[in-house]
Structures are given as structure tokens and as C-alpha cells.
């Protein structure tokens, strides 16, 4: 499981013209792009959620748990792209939807269980993600 985390001052996800998830404008928050591979499980999803919740990448070396920062969770199978050969990425390392969707849901639920204000995109949808990266700070978490 991979989570590409970006510190943001605002973020929103739109599907078919409707905003389905957004962080308050001018709030300090996190955008979490979540990729799942074949060997991932619920335990990994929960451990990564806890790691993200306590990761000190906000201003003054604080974590989302320290300041109650909101988190926007968006599924992102392309985090498992293999570009080693040719010019077309392979997606073979990305888990199929039947495996990935429940784990992305588990990740978001685990964050909520820790006390996070969580917004989400729509799994498998063609999403438009808008964000203002703060810093910029971008970190790849992986278990």
C-alpha cells in the first residue's frame, strides 16, 4: 500500500461536475492519494492510517492529530505504475477493484476512527482533483 501525501491549504474532488469531497478553504490539511497492491490487507490500511494521522509534516512540525487537520482521501491506482519498459505504464502491480476498494474504504474509516475529519473521492470514478500544495510538502508513505 502506498499513500502519496501532500500538505495542502485547500483541496477538492469533483465527479461529473459535482464536488464530492473538499477541505475547507485556507485550512491546513492533507491530501492522501492511496494506491493498493495485491498483497495489501486491512492491517496495512489501519497502520498506514495511523502513520499518516501522526506524521509531523504540518507547520511547526505538527501532525494532523495535533491540530485536527482535515484529510481528503482519494484512490489512486496509478501509484503502482511500472514504467521500467517502453513508453506505456503497466498497471499489473495495482490491485483490482475488488481488493482495492475495501482497503481504501478501510484506510479512510481508520482515519475517522482516530478522530480525523475525512472527506473522500469516489472509487473508480473519473475524478478531477484540485489542490493548493502548501510548501510544497509531498511525502510517499509505504508499508
From Swiss-Prot:
One biological process term from GO is:
D-amino acid catabolic process
Residue interval(s) of motif Gly-cisPro motif, important for rejection of L-amino acids? 135-136
- Reading the lineage from the top rank, the first entry is Bacteria
Q: Name one GO molecular function term.
A: Gly-tRNA(Ala) deacylase activity
UniProt keyword Methyltransferase present = no
* One GO location term (cellular component): cytoplasm
Q: Which InterPro entries does UniProt cross-reference here?
A: Daa-tRNA_deacyls_DTD, DTD-like_sf
State the top-level EC class: hydrolase
* UniProt keyword annotation of ATP-binding present: no
Q: What is its main location?
A: cytoplasm
Which Enzyme Commission number(s) are on file for it? 3.1.1.96
State the UniProt keywords alphabetically: Cytoplasm, Hydrolase, RNA-binding, tRNA-binding
**What reaction does this enzyme carry out catalytically?**
glycyl-tRNA(Ala) + H2O = tRNA(Ala) + glycine + H(+); a D-aminoacyl-tRNA + H2O = a tRNA + a D-alpha-amino acid + H(+)
Q: Where in the cell is it found?
A: Cytoplasm
Pfam families found in the cross-reference section: Tyr_Deacylase
Database matches in Gene3D superfamilies: D-tyrosyl-tRNA(Tyr) deacylase
Complex and partners: Homodimer.
NCBIfam families for the chain: D-aminoacyl-tRNA deacylase
Can you quote the domain comment? A Gly-cisPro motif from one monomer fits into the active site of the other monomer to allow specific chiral rejection of L-amino acids.
Entry similarity comment: Belongs to the DTD family.
Q: What does this protein do?
A: An aminoacyl-tRNA editing enzyme that deacylates mischarged D-aminoacyl-tRNAs. Also deacylates mischarged glycyl-tRNA(Ala), protecting cells against glycine mischarging by AlaRS. Acts via tRNA-based rather than protein-based catalysis; rejects L-amino acids rather than detecting D-amino acids in the active site. By recycling D-aminoacyl-tRNA to D-amino acids and free tRNA molecules, this enzyme counteracts the toxicity associated with the formation of D-aminoacyl-tRNA entities in vivo and helps enforce protein L-homochirality.
Please report the name of this protein according to its UniProt entry.
D-aminoacyl-tRNA deacylase
Gene (UniProt): dtd
